[in-house]
Each structure stands twice: as structure tokens, then as C-alpha cells.
Amino acid sequence: MPKLKLIGVDLGGTTFSVGLVSEDGKILKKVTRDTLVENGKEDVIRRIAETILEVSDGEEAPYVGIGSPGSIDRENGIVRFSPNFPDWHNVPLTDELAKRTGKKVFLENDANAFVLGEKWFGAGRGHDHIVALTLGTGIGGGVVTHGYLLTGRDGIGAELGHVVVEPNGPMCNCGTRGCLEAVASATAIRRFLREGYKKYHSSLVYKLAGSPEKADAKHLFDAARQGDRFALMIRDRVVDALARAVAGYIHIFNPEIVIIGGGISRAGEILFGPLREKVVDYIMPSFVGTYEVVASPLVEDAGILGAASIIKERIGG
């Protein structure tokens, strides 16, 4: 009897990816396509279904996991709303995909899918208490406690990117001032670099980028490695914000491991070294040494593996 394979769908506002995944987390096949949100939800759903059938052709793959941005009803498979999909309101996504593919479909918020991917296939394997944070255009995350995903009453808990770390800081898209997302996301870093050009125009960051408009997190951390004063100043602000947030998560959830993923996590020790040191400054002594702070090993495949892990979570591994 052939081994069961999993289908993971990483749904984004710009592109979506569908992957065929082995039970031990190897991606056997992957297709990425433009989402084309402007064509409307019917077209998006149709093309996702077609891609699922393409990827699973000839394979024993009866289950699909899908990680979606926005507010979702995980039990009923409904996307309530998503800023990435303006015309999606109470869309019964799992039912629609099941009708078109003949497969059992499970839905989860993409940030929750990220922590599940770490639990089953990433740095969280073997751990029952996990906090996972993904640093990209925005900041999302999820929490596993006693081996189970923490979702809250309405399934929208663990909004880790929206803890306030700078009460008088930049305005966040959510309408609150000083959220972690407004200080430590890739979007926030690009904004800081644009705003800093007038005063710090001689910074190595801008030489590496070619112009202030092109300057991003990669240029920032590359310049910081070479000791650029402005780059280190922004790096320290990002680290302080992350450390305050992570310290809060440690106090509240008492995790064994804090996993940080997303594009910014690729910065390596120029980010993680000072972050680990700063977290210690903000936590109670009794918590020191009870946790690890690590980079996600999943990198580009985190979305598909997270989506595939939804299946393992729902059908019992």
C-alpha cells in the first residue's frame, strides 16, 4: 500500500503555492501561481482546485490543508474576511475546494499553520510548548501549549504581532500605536530607512541599496555586519522591540522554544545574538535558561509545510 501523502496550500494575496508533501515533511512537488485576486473569488478558488488536482495526480493524497491569511472559522472551513482578499466575506473555502477536488479539506489561519509546521516538521519537533513568530511584511505567530494549538475563544487568539512594544511608537495598520509589527516587520524597517535618509544619507545601507527607496532589511543587516552606525541603530531598535515581545511571551506561555521565521530571520547572528542577550534583560530570573530562541529551519517552505501539518494535526498525525 503506498504511503499517504499530504497536500499543503499556502494562500497569499500575491501568489499561492500547492505542494505534495511526504508524511515526514519532504516536499515532493510544488507549483506556485499568481493569485490574481482582482479576478474575483470564484476564479481564485477554481485555480487553486485545479492546481491541487495537478499536484496530486496519480498520488494517494486524499487530504488538503490550507493556510489562509485573515480571520477564519477553522471548524467550519470559512474565511470570514481577509485584507488580502477584499471580496471574500464568509467564504466556505473548504466546502468549495472539496466539491471541486473530491478531497477532505482543512483550513487554518496562516500564522497558526506556521507554528504547526514547526511543531511537526521544524525546530519545534519534540516540544510541547512552542511560540513561533514570523517576521515578514507583517508579523504573525502562533502558540502551542501542552502539544495543542492555542486559538482562544473565537479562534483568533495569539495575535503576537500586535502586542504594544513602543506605546508612543509608529502607527500600526491595525489602528494601534507601537505594535511589534509597526517596529520590527520588514515594512517597518523599510519605513525607518526611508525616513532616515535625510540625516544619515552617507550610511552604507544606501550605498548597498542604490537608493533610499530600494533599501530594505537585507541591506540593513549587511551594513550592520560591517559596523555601520545607522544600521546598528535601527538593528538595535528592532532587537529591543522583539526582545520586549518575546519576554512577554515567555512570561505568559512558558515555552520550551521560541522560533522566529520569515525573511528577517535569515539575518542570522547579527539579529539573534543581541536578541538572545536582550531577552534576558526583560525576563524574570526564574525564566532564564528555561527556553531557546532559534531561527526557523523551514525558510521558503514554511507555508506549504505549515499547511500540510494542519492535516496531521486534524487527523492525528
Curated annotation (Swiss-Prot):
The protein's required cofactors: a divalent metal cation
Organism name: Thermotoga maritima (strain ATCC 43589 / DSM 3109 / JCM 10099 / NBRC 100826 / MSB8)
Family: Belongs to the ROK (NagC/XylR) family.
Function per UniProt: Catalyzes the phosphorylation of D-glucose to D-glucose 6-phosphate using ATP as the phosphate donor. Can also phosphorylate 2-deoxyglucose, with lower efficiency. ITP can also serve as a phosphoryl donor.
Record NCBIfam families: ROK_glcA_fam
Keywords: ATP-binding, Carbohydrate metabolism, Glucose metabolism, Kinase, Magnesium, Nucleotide-binding, Transferase
Co-factor remark: Mg(2+) is the most effective ion. It can be efficiently replaced with Mn(2+) or Co(2+) and to some extent with Ni(2+).
Top-level taxon of origin: Bacteria
Family matches, as InterPro entries: ATPase_NBD, ROK, ROK_cs, ROK_glcA
Name of protein: Glucokinase
GO CC terms in record: cytoplasm
Gene that encodes the chain: glk
pH curve summary: Optimum pH is 7.3.
PROSITE patterns listed in its UniProt record: ROK
Gene Ontology process terms (BP): glucose metabolic process; glycolytic process
Catalytic activity: D-glucose + ATP = D-glucose 6-phosphate + ADP + H(+)
Gene3D superfamilies recorded: 3.30.420.40
UniProt entry tagged with the keyword ATP-binding: yes
CDD domains: ASKHA_NBD_ROK_TmGLK-like
Subunit-structure text: Homodimer.
Lineage start: Bacteria, Thermotogati, Thermotogota, Thermotogae, Thermotogales
GO molecular function: ATP binding; glucokinase activity
Temperature effects on activity: Optimum temperature is 93 degrees Celsius.
EC number, as in UniProt: 2.7.1.2
